[in-house]
Amino acid sequence: MNLRSVTSLYDIVGASDMTPNSSGARPHSVLVVDDHEDTRQMSLIVLRAQGFHASAAPSGDAAFLRACEERPDVIVTDLAMPEGNGWELIDKLSSDTRTKDIPVVMLTACATESVRRRAEEARLAAFFFKPCAPDVLAAELRRLSAERAS
């Protein structure tokens, strides 16, 4: 087995992605929703290193409250969580006037055809299976944030 050694954040996200937003504009904001503490913390580290303003919530219920309060540019949510799963969160967000226009990206380990179909029906902004390369996710979040801002 060949394991790659990670000695710094540069090894995870790539040195070219470590530069903060150089335009002087307000950083794009992302709300990360995942019930696993380690996943939330790593997501925050990676997104902040790539110039995003990132916050996190441990459940769909907590994320909905935070989304109403913070109005992030994009929400990245896991699917399987206690206290409000990803589908329940998407339903709440899309039916509330304060949050219905926030793009939602699903990032899940549930790599099944039925999940993919339901994601299409839910009209998610994007859908990724875990593991997902940080630079790919960051590029999509930048695109969605810029699209929403225009």
Give residue spans per PLM region:
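Short hydrophobic/Thr-rich beta-strand motif most characteristic of the beta2 strand and flanking loop
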Residues: 51-58, 66
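A Lys-centered signature of the CheY-like receiver
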Residues: 130
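Non-catalytic signal-transmission and effector/linker regions of two-component phosphorelay proteins
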Residues: 1-29, 44, 135-150
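Receiver (REC) domain active-site loop signature in two-component systems and cognate sites
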Residues: 81
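Charged docking surfaces used in two-component/phosphorelay signaling
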Residues: 41-49
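Active-site residues of response regulator receiver
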Residues: 78, 108
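Active-site beta3 strand of CheY-like receiver
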Residues: 70-76
